[in-house]
Design a protein with these regions (language model features):
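A short, solvent-exposed loop/turn motif at the edges and junctions
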Residues: 51-56, 79-94
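Short, acidic Ser/Thr/Gly-rich low-complexity loop/linker segments typical of extracellular
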Residues: 52-68
Length: 816
């Protein structure tokens, strides 16, 4: 039996070897560029068709964002043509192609008659899967109509947003969020809160880059999320108006306008919104005596309303100073006022769970926020394709103020009433200078170099009356100068990209009220490397490495920033150091006619990783110890995971997108502190956690052209050194219908259909407290949105049809 099996295997091997060694038809490389006649603007997703004279077989490819195409065809006689929706075809006469050839620049002219008579219904896919990144196109996602950028990110593959608005990529909260490829003042001082205020309608797409090249900011151990703001691209005057209303009480409107000619492009966006986001939380805690016996129980019940009213405006102009020089200027404003009443009841019980009293704490808070940013960009294009120089400038200012009056009393005892006032004023200034140079070398080489200077100053003034012990003024200064260079090339089926980034950091953390001054100066080299191999046009694999940094900011550093609870207080740590991460990613991409599949295995090793610890403060409220939560540096964190994404279109009327991520996280470290009794308390944070996350999105076109979209997510349980989070499932629904001859649409979306989206935690501090908590930032929401489009319908340049496989054709590995 074994001999027969051996003979069969050898025979099969010889047959396969002989088949693999058969002579293949000669392949040649065809390249070139497609532009719009008259404006010289590149045409993205134009199709280059090669039709074999004898067999009539079709082959070819599409252009990238720069209008450039490059693909292989079998040598032979062809008729060649360039096609682009609403443009006249360009035909190239019959010719024999036997060697590599550059077709040069192909100019295409708009077909005016066709534009008048045709409504183009093809559209961008919601999610595009590429080997090195995922692109989420906001425009076609019904779930985020009338929502915020936080809602947008919560629909992006690989990204999760927890109940408090914290953004994580593959479960890693060490994420750098960019706007239009740069750090931006629009993200505000508290980025989680800012993302809840920015309207989704202002965003065109979101790019998720898990292992960025040296060109990008080195910050973000988990990767980079780049939010690309909307800017009209179609010729003439175009725009859209959107109005929405929902329950809980929510309403708003936004207007997008742009006017484009050969010499300039004016773009603008204005939005107004009023939102009420009621939420709630609970904590059930059991406190212990020093000998481990139960001391008491406390039930904490919290309700809050987060009412915000604000506007945002963005105005800009692209000036085509010449065919090779463009100057862009943009000015953005954002203002918001908030009312955030927070009402907490503490129900006290003795060790036998007999009621002993009830305390009420009302935090009546109002807030105001204003952000302004001016940005300018110069782009110089040289004669050779992709040879260019860009210079970016940005200046931003942010102000965030919070004023609160806190009323605290024992129910039934008016004399116990205590009143506190808190004022929290924040100011931020950020200046940015960035320049990037790209030089193509030879047939497939690419050299890049650049500089980025980021200069930031934050001032936080926190005042508590009448208890001045909790008051503090914190000054944070961050100056980072960065230089990078990288080079990439391609030969046969291999391509590579090697880069090195150097960052010199000067950080000051000064607690002015406490006379505590900290200055930290450090510099780091951040290497990056990517190797890619293409098995075929539809299958490729890549291996990448990068070094990343995560700098603590804001509440991580401020010793005092909130008193919303008087027994559970968050306290920043001004001595915390940045963490450094080595990231390795192995990815595979496969495309079929109806399916795109991307999978990756990744490893992140982080030194000085951030970890939140809880400890006794030495203070008591009615005999209850006040617990402090504070961040520290642990020695190491190991994170290894596996992820896959897929787009599947089984039918023209049904599209599926799925994302699954699982990872194992191991932390190693010990922490010791001296408690209020003078005892040295040692805590071991060695912990191994395993968890997973999945999201499935289904979009179905029903009869009468009604679109139905369903999003279902599940976050599995996860343990940590002092407890665990429990699993949570949630679902969103949306329906949309185009009306008025496709010039308008109306949509209905329901967020958190089962009202189940919460953060559920179990915490254990030995001989101190065991607790169970639930936190729901926003209850179920229902929203109706009406959108009207004028002079653009669905035939804008930025809505050209993409392949069903959502492939990233033309992407050079490592290229941003």
């Amino acid at each position: 039996m074994n001999k027969k099996l051996l003979i069969a295997v050898v025979t099969l091997f010889i047959s396969l070897t002989a088949f693999a060694q058969r002579p293949e038809s000669k392949k040649i490389t065809v390249s070139g560029k497609v532009i719009e006649k008259g404006t010289d603007l590149p045409l993205e997703y134009a199709t280059i068709v090669f039709e074999n004279i004898k067999t009539k077989q079709l082959s070819g490819g599409i252009t990238d964002e720069n209008g450039v195409f490059k693909f292989e065809v079998v040598a032979g006689n062809y008729n060649v043509r360039a096609e682009y929706i609403s443009f006249k075809n360009v035909n190239i006469s019959q010719k024999e192609y036997n060697s590599d050839i550059n077709l040069g620049i192909i100019q295409m002219e708009a077909d005016v008659a066709q534009l008048k008579d045709i409504d183009i219904i093809a559209e961008k896919s919601t999610v595009e899967i590429k080997l090195d990144k995922r692109v989420y196109n906001v425009g076609k996602d019904m779930m985020v109509k009338g929502g915020t950028v936080s809602d947008v990110l919560d629909n992006v593959p690989s990204v999760t947003v927890d109940a408090e608005g914290t953004v994580a990529l593959r479960g890693n909260e060490s994420v750098k969020i960019l706007i239009d490829g740069k750090p931006s003042g629009l993200a505000g001082i508290n980025i989680a809160d800012a993302l809840k205020l920015l309207p989704a309608d202002a965003v065109e797409k979101v790019e998720v880059i898990t292992n960025p090249s040296a060109r990008y900011d080195a910050e973000g151990g988990g990767g980079i999320i780049n939010i690309v703001l909307r800017k009209g691209k179609a010729n003439g005057v175009n725009g859209s108006i959107m109005v929405n209303a929902g329950d809980p009480e929510t309403y708003g409107t936004s207007v997008n306008l742009n006017k484009k000619s050969d010499d300039y492009n004016l773009f603008s966006n204005f939005g107004y919104n009023y939102r009420n986001n009621p939420g709630n939380s609970l904590v059930d805690a059991e406190y212990f005596n020093a000998d481990g016996t139960t001391s008491r129980f406390i039930e904490e019940r919290r309700t809050n309303d987060r009412i915000s009213e604000g506007y945002n405006a963005n105005f800009g102009i692209d000036l085509n100073l010449s065919k090779s020089l463009t100057w862009t200027n943009a000015l953005t404003f954002r203002e918001n006022d908030g009312k955030n009443p927070d009402n907490v009841y503490f129900n006290y019980f003795d060790a036998s769970y007999n009621p002993t009293g009830v305390r009420n704490r009302l935090n009546d808070q109002i807030s105001d926020e204003f952000s302004m940013e001016y940005s300018s960009n110069f782009t110089k294009k040289f004669k050779k394709d992709d040879h260019k120089l860009t210079v970016d400038l940005a200046f931003s200012q942010n102000k965030e103020n919070e004023y609160a009056t806190i009323y605290d009393q024992i129910i039934g005892d008016p004399s116990s009433l205590e009143t506190q006032g808190t004022t929290n004023k924040n100011k931020q200034q950020r200046n940015l200078l960035q320049t990037d140079y790209v030089l193509p070398i030879g047939k497939s080489g690419r050299f890049e170099a650049g500089y980025r200077g980021s200069f930031q100053k934050n001032l936080t003034d926190f005042v508590v009356t009448p208890i001045s012990d909790f008051s503090n003024t914190l000054e944070y200064v961050e100056n980072v100068n960065a230089f990078y260079t990288q080079y990439g090339s391609k030969f046969n089926k291999f391509s590579y990209f090697l880069g090195l980034r150097f960052e010199d950091s000067h950080i000051e953390v000064n607690s002015l009220s406490l006379n505590n001054y900290n200055t930290k100066k450090y510099n780091n080299f951040f290497p990056s490397a990517t190797v890619n191999y293409e098995f075929s046009e539809s299958s490729s694999v890549s291996l990448s490495y990068s070094k990343r940094i995560n700098r603590p900011r804001g509440r991580f550093l401020n010793p005092v920033s909130s008193l919303s609870s008087n027994i559970n207080i968050f306290q920043g740590n001004p001595d915390i150091d940045p963490s450094l991460t080595d990231a390795i990613d192995l990815g595979y991409l496969k495309k079929w006619s109806k399916l795109t599949f991307n999978t990756s295995a990744y490893i992140n090793i982080t030194n000085d990783a951030f970890q939140f610890i809880r400890k006794e403060s030495g203070l008591f409220v009615d005999g209850v110890p006040v617990i402090l939560s504070t961040p520290i540096n642990l020695s190491k964190e190991y994170r290894a995971g596996f992820e896959f994404n897929l787009n599947y279109t089984p039918y023209k009327w049904w599209r599926l997108n799925g994302n699954f991520n699982t990872f194992r996280s191991e932390t190693q470290g010990d922490y010791s502190y001296v408690d209020y009794l003078g005892n040295t308390i040692s805590q071991n944070f060695d912990n191994v956690a395993f968890t997973w996350f999945t999201r499935i999105t289904s979009k179905i076109t029903l009869p009468y052209k009604i679109d139905w979209q369903t999003n279902a997510t599940y976050n599995a349980p996860q343990t940590n050194a002092q407890g665990k989070s429990l699993g949570v499932a949630s679902m969103n629904l949306a329906f949309s219908k185009d009306i008025l001859k496709d010039k308008a649409s109306i949509s209905l979306n329901i967020s958190d259909v089962f009202n189940s989206r919460k953060r559920i935690m179990e915490t254990n501090i030995p001989n101190v407290v065991n607790s169970y908590s639930e936190m729901q930032w926003r209850v179920r929401q229902v929203m109706v949105t009406f959108t009207y489009r004028f002079n653009k319908q669905k035939n804008e340049r930025d809505r050209q049809p993409r392949r069903d496989d959502n492939g990233g054709e033309g992407d050079f590995m490592g290229r941003p």
